[in-house]
Amino acid sequence: RLYYLEECKKIADVHVATDDGSEGYKGFVTELLRNRLLEMSRAELDNLVFYNCGPSPMVHAAAKVQREFCRDDQIFSAIDYLTKCGVGICGACASPDGKRICVDGPFMQGSPERPAAN
């Protein structure tokens, strides 16, 4: 089931990809993304902002495709990593650059690095 699809369609141009083709494009979201970006003019590409959210492999793959067409400052990502305290004290969600997902995120520019093992 795809949650909030109708709500998203009210505020954005929505393109859906499902692995099994049960809704929208059949295949990986990165394939749909690349096809859509290839259709756009330079002016359209320059005005895009991406908000990636989901499992690490998908977010990193999407950001990689986006970087082929757009600048890093247009790409923001949130990855589902474990957070413990939620207020930045324990450091469980700290990435190698010191950013803490619980207080500096959840969306960070580019593709956030995996938190360091504690």
Predicted regions and their residues:
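FNR/FR-type flavoprotein reductase catalytic core
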Residues: 1-83
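Local cysteine-cluster metal-coordination motifs and their immediate loop/turn environment
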Residues: 56-61, 80-106
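Short microdomains enriched in Cys/His and/or Lys/Arg
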Residues: 107-118
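Generic secondary-structure boundary signal with a strong preference for alpha-helix termini
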Residues: 66, 98-102, 117
